[in-house]
Amino acid sequence: MRLRYLFGLGVPVAAMALWANSGTSHSQTPVDEAAKVRCATRLSLSLTGKAPSASLLAAADPQAQIDTLLADPAFVEQFSRFVNSQMNPEPAMTPAQDSTYYLAKYVLENQKPWHEMFDGQYDIKAVAAANGMPATADVVADANGLGYFRSRPWMIRYAGNEEAGYRLSAAFRIQQNIIGLDVGAVTNAPGVDVSATGRMSGNCRGCHYDPYFALDKVAKILSKRVDTNPISFSPPTEGPQTILDGQTIANDGDLVKALLASNDYKFRTCRLAFVFLYGRPEASCESALFDKCIDDFTQTGDVRAALRAVAADPGFCE
């Protein structure tokens, strides 16, 4: 199942009329009124995917209504789909494998801090199709949960195909989801040794053993894939690894905790806010706004605070 990030289209007739009049009669529709309509429209489409409501169009200051838009179920759906598209770029085989979507929606609907996406005590359970209803998934409490990273559908999705069972895909994906790790894919030449030993040599070390994110070292503290039909996993056995600039990490819980404590996590969250609202990362000239986004997010831990900081900036409606 592919959950896509969709923007709604269309503007109310009243708004179109205001735009039309603004171009023909300044006495009937002042410039600031047209600007208000444009601002209301941009805010509503960006945050909820819907055309602005009559009350938003009538508001003296549309940006003062941002909290109302952030409380709209349409925003929850829109942002959950967006986050899923950013953290799982390929289509999933089942709804439950889009665990990011379901947990993002749960966190937003229940006003949870954003870090619970990654370290909350939850599990994502597949719900089979029944009685004419399509297959879906549920978020349930689980004392052993680690966001969605220990949910079986997600683990299967990123079990990978490394010959010894190291979950390199999961090692990358956990870091990509939390801190926005970006590693370019490399195609090996025929006959290249792709085993753990082979990855220790040449250019392969640059991603797998040497850097901050050392994929092989991270994979060693994750459970291993031991069977393929059905897929099963066994606990890690190779002990703590020194990764993330010299930190000693023993398991996936330690890994997630360290990533969430990093400035990279805050940076990642605010970049998501910019991409969601602007369709692009932050520009260098927006450094002050980006810093405010990070400050507001740090104070509350609520991803809505990051989005509010960006959407409430005067430049958003200019």
How does the language model describe each region?
Residues 1-11:
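Bacterial N-terminal signal peptides that target proteins for export
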Residues 26-32, 155-167, 206, 211, ...:
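Electron-transfer interface patches adjacent to heme c in soluble/periplasmic c-type cytochromes
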Residues 28-69:
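N-terminal mature-domain "stem" immediately C-terminal to a signal peptide or N-terminal signal-anchor/transmembrane
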Residues 38, 43, 74-87, 264, ...:
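Long, charged, low-complexity terminal extensions
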Residues 43-44, 49, 83, 273, ...:
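Residue-level detector of buried hydrophobic side-chain packing
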Residues 65-214, 291-299, 311-312:
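Extended surface/linker regions that mediate inter-domain or inter-protein docking
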Residues 309-318:
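Short, amphipathic C-terminal "tail helix"
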